[in-house]
Curated annotation (Swiss-Prot):
Function, in words: One of several proteins that assist in the late maturation steps of the functional core of the 30S ribosomal subunit. Associates with free 30S ribosomal subunits (but not with 30S subunits that are part of 70S ribosomes or polysomes). Required for efficient processing of 16S rRNA. May interact with the 5'-terminal helix region of 16S rRNA.
Subcellular location: Cytoplasm
UniProt key word Cell inner membrane: no
This protein's name: Ribosome-binding factor A
Keyword field: Cytoplasm, Ribosome biogenesis
Organism: Yersinia enterocolitica
DNA damage is among the record's keywords: no
An example molecular function term from Gene Ontology annotations: ribosomal small subunit binding
Designated gene of the protein: rbfA
InterPro entries documented for this protein: KH_dom-like_a/b, RbfA, RbfA_dom_sf, Ribosome-bd_factorA_CS
Source organism superkingdom: Bacteria
Length: 133
């Protein structure tokens, strides 16, 4: 059983994702995905966590995420207006955007595990070239 705030946040996540995909034309936003929403108990404030897929490329500018968040924050009033039209809420929450680095952190952890496994296999194949003597 879900509470009302959980249901509203799930629906908001879907709607904001659609709005970002269809309505926001700012090039700084690029390929943004909504990874989660924290909604206050009174539904007046929403913290929207976003991930930018163009940050995942190797040649990405380190400020890409910062610029994307700034662009979303600048457009938050427009996004809030569109959200109010899409959802039937008495009070449309005030939106703040935050960068969610869990996807990048997860990929980094996965690479670390892959490298450890690869090194372990190499040690089993070549036991004489090990540092431990």
């Amino acid at each position: 059983e879900f509470s009302r705030s959980q249901r509203v946040s799930q629906e908001m996540q879907k709607e904001i994702a659609l709005i970002l995909q269809r309505e926001i034309k700012d090039p700084r936003v690029g390929m943004a995905t909504v990874s989660g929403i924290e909604l206050s108990r009174d539904l007046a404030y929403a913290k929207v966590f976003v991930t930018f897929l163009n940050v995942l490329t190797d040649n990405a500018d380190p400020d890409t995420a910062k610029n994307g968040i700034k662009a979303l924050q600048d457009a938050s009033g427009y996004i809030r207006t569109l959200l109010g039209k899409a959802m039937r809420l008495r009070i449309v929450p005030e939106l703040t955007f935050a960068y969610d680095n869990s996807l990048i952190e997860g990929m980094r952890m996965s690479n670390l595990v892959t490298n450890v496994i690869k090194n372990d296999v190499e040690r089993q194949v070549n036991p004489g070239s090990d540092e431990e003597k």
